[in-house]
């Protein structure tokens, strides 16, 4: 009887360890320094320790500034790297039961713009096109060719660079892109475009890639 109990406890422990090894925090700790130039390995470990101890997870980064991990879940991490930049990570299951890591790096100066990347759990970069078809200008700005207002058309021409802020969700497997091009434009031109702006573009993770969920003209 004792042998069976011991074997059961060993198997349960191994199962729990296996689950923990698949959590975002484990992959985050093992992230190569080359992909985390602002944070040291000690910084990354301290983030986890602080949050798990119910403490504010703020560290002094490699360049002497303050960085704070603001969210930690089994499959999600968010860090405020600097006052103007943030980093997010999401652990996503693929159709063949393996997992990939999605990261979003956002910088605001002052308009926010994000870069989305995908990696294996060993932090080898994967082609983004295999997992996401990114949104384009027309997904956010619906400016009909029939618009005759010169000021509106002029404002549309000033929106010549697509800037978007991407956000991974801690609660589900969605990825949301918000149009930020108007944040770098002059206020008057941005106001002219407001009636033609669509809602944020939302993608949902399905069968190993992000699929467009909804866009709206509202």
Label for each model-derived stretch:
Residues 79-80, 106-112, 189-194:
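Short consensus segments that form the blades of beta-propeller domains
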